[in-house]
Amino acid sequence: MKHKVGILGGTFDPPHLAHLRMAEEAKKQLGLEKILFLPNKIPPHKHISGMASSDERVEMLQLMIEGIDSFEIDTRELMRAGKSYTYDTMRDMISEQPDTDFYFIIGGDMVEYLPKWYHIDDLVKMVTFVGVNRPSYQTEVPYDIVKINMPETTISSTEIRNNIENASTFLPEKVWSYIKEHQLYGKK
C-alpha cells in the first residue's frame, strides 16, 4: 500500500494560522500520513524590502509546527539554484519516494492560477491537487481537483505584513513572538 503525503507549498512570509488549519484539515479529511511544508524562494519580482529571509521563514515554520510529529519542512526549493518549479520538485520527490502518493494542497487563489503553472498537464498526472476554498476566487479549472471543506478565512500573509501591529490573532503565539523579537515587517 502506498503512503499518502500532503505538500503545502508557499512563501510562508509569515506562516499563519490559516496555513496550519489547511494542513490539519487536509490531513484529517484525506487520511494523509504527514504534511510537508515546502517553503519556496521569493521570486525576484516579488521581493519587497522588509520581507523575511529564507532562514527566518524556515525558523517561523519550525516554530509553527513544533510538537506536531506528522508535520515536517522540506527546504529543497530554497536550496535550488535558478528558477524552482513545482514540476521539478515533484519529479524529484516521486523519484526519491516511488511508494508515495503526493497530495499538493493549494488555496483558492492558486486553484485559479493553476492553468498557468509550468508543465501543468504533466503535473496533474504526477500529484493529486487539493483545493481549499478561499473567498472571492473561482475554483473551477479544467483539471481534477479534490476539494476540502474548511471554514473560509480571509487571512493572508500579505495582509498580515501590511498590518503587522494588529496581526497577533492570526499567528501562532511563537511565530508572533519571533516576529517581535527579530523586528520583522516593521514590528518594533
Swiss-Prot record:
Any one GO MF annotation of this record: ATP binding
Gene3D superfamilies: HUPs
Pathway(s) where this gene product acts: Cofactor biosynthesis; NAD(+) biosynthesis; deamido-NAD(+) from nicotinate D-ribonucleotide: step 1/1
Record keyword Acyltransferase present: no
Residue ranges that the Swiss-Prot or TrEMBL entry lists as coiled coil: none
Pfam (any one): CTP_transf_like
Assigned EC number: 2.7.7.18
Matching InterPro entries: Cyt_trans-like (IPR004821), NadD/NMNAT (IPR005248), Rossmann-like_a/b/a_fold (IPR014729)
UniProt catalytic activity: nicotinate beta-D-ribonucleotide + ATP + H(+) = deamido-NAD(+) + diphosphate
Single biological process term from Gene Ontology: NAD biosynthetic process
Keywords associated with the record: ATP-binding, NAD, Nucleotide-binding, Nucleotidyltransferase, Pyridine nucleotide biosynthesis, Transferase
NCBIfam families to which the protein is assigned, alphabetical: cyt_tran_rel (TIGR00125), nicotinate (nicotinamide) nucleotide adenylyltransferase (TIGR00482), PRK00071.1-3 (NF000840), PRK00071.1-4 (NF000841)
Function of the protein: Catalyzes the reversible adenylation of nicotinate mononucleotide (NaMN) to nicotinic acid adenine dinucleotide (NaAD).
Protein name: Probable nicotinate-nucleotide adenylyltransferase
Source taxonomy: Bacteria, Bacillati, Bacillota, Bacilli, Bacillales
Gene transcribed to yield this protein: nadD
